[in-house]
Design a protein with these regions (language model features):
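Generic detector of N-terminal low-structure segments
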Residues: 4-5, 26, 68
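Short, mixed-charge low-complexity intrinsically disordered segments
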Residues: 38-69
Length: 69
């Protein structure tokens, strides 16, 4: 976000939309999609890699059985 706002401010002062502005705009959108996917996985308990499951309470299960009694 820091780099995005820095580039955005420089472009505004210059008065033109250059290649860097478009690149950081796309990068910002890509990060938003990534964080949306990760948040959805955290809420719904979707396995995200190699059998690991992250639950909505933040506990990460790695295939072993946890007994909470």
């Amino acid at each position: 976000m820091f780099f995005y706002t820095t580039i955005e401010n420089q472009v505004r002062n210059d008065g033109s939309r250059g290649l860097l502005y478009d690149h950081f705009d796309d990068l910002n959108a890509a990060y938003a999609k990534l964080y949306t996917i990760l948040a959805a996985a955290a809420v719904s308990g979707i396995p995200y890699h190699s059998g690991h499951i992250i639950r909505s309470d933040g506990l990460i299960l790695d295939g072993r059985v946890f007994d909470r009694r």
